[in-house]
Structure formats: structure tokens, C-alpha cells
Design a protein with these regions (language model features):
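Fe(II)/2-oxoglutarate oxygenase catalytic core
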Residues: 1-149
Length: 149
């Protein structure tokens, strides 16, 4: 199988978020701030997944063991993910628990599998940057420390 989206497509469910004000489970809680669908793809699930993880490790210079399971995320027309930070907020119960289990996130790598007809940009509001998605492109951004909201 050469397409990670086909591998996990049957498992797509409404995306969740980690929030300080509500109880969450391992995949977070549903929120109007994030209206996409997602599925987790564990390391070792297929040769393709392992190949993608190995390439991500080489690109980022992070060990494969430190890379989370891949997330397949699908945005239908009108879906969005409101401005947010990808790291876990250490001052919240859910953030502290996730950091204790798996450590703090230090970066995000997005691989674009499709070029949308419209929309789909990733915005970096503080830096006033906009990244438009295109099939085959990747976006890597890192955060050195948790940032006060």
C-alpha cells in the first residue's frame, strides 16, 4: 500500500483537542475549535508508515522512538482548526499527564497528501506567515518551550 490515507481512512473519527477546562481522554475532547477527522497510525503498522517515520527522523534529526504515531487528518469543506499551540500546556491536568506519559512535544511535521481546491492554509499568527498546502509538500515547525497564552 503506497498511500497512508488509504491505510487509516476507515478509522477516521472526529478530531479531539486537549483543553484545560474539560476532562479529556487519550484522543482529547471534541471541540468546535477543531472540526476535522483524524486517525492514528502506529509505528510498525506497515512498511510505508515505517519508511515515512524514518524519513521524518532523518529530516528532523529526532530518533524514531521520540516521534509520536502519525495522525491522518482530513479536513472536509468548511472544516478548520482554530489558532492553537501543538505542545501540551504543562499547567493543565491533561497537559501535565500527557507530558508525564510521553514527554513534551517539540515540533510538528505536516505532510500534505492532497492539494485542496480552496483554503487549507496553516497560519502562524505571531509571525504573520501563511503556508498554503500542496500535494507532496511538507511543513516543519518547532517550539523550544511552552509559550504563555
Amino acid at each position: 500500500m503506497r498511500r497512508p490515507d488509504r491505510l487509516a481512512e476507515p478509522e477516521l473519527r472526529r478530531s479531539g483537542v486537549f483543553t484545560p477546562d474539560i476532562e479529556t481522554n487519550a484522543v482529547g475532547a471534541q471541540s468546535y475549535a477543531r472540526t476535522s477527522d483524524q486517525a492514528s497510525i502506529a509505528h510498525g503498522r506497515s512498511e510505508l508508515v515505517d519508511h515515512i517515520c524514518a524519513r521524518a527522523a532523518r529530516l528532523t534529526q529526532w530518533p524514531v522512538a521520540a516521534i509520536e504515531a502519525m495522525q491522518l487528518v482530513r479536513y472536509r469543506p468548511g472544516a478548520e482548526f482554530s489558532p492553537h499551540y501543538d505542545y501540551f500546556h504543562p499547567d493543565t491536568e491533561s497537559g501535565a499527564a500527557e507530558i508525564a506519559r510521553n514527554g513534551q512535544r517539540v515540533g510538528t511535521l505536516i505532510l500534505y497528501l492532497k492539494t485542496p481546491r480552496r483554503g487549507g492554509a496553516t497560519l502562524f499568527l505571531d509571525a504573520e506567515l501563511e503556508f498554503l498546502p500542496a500535494r507532496g509538500n511538507a511543513l516543519l515547525f518547532c517550539y523550544g518551550r511552552a509559550h504563555d497564552d
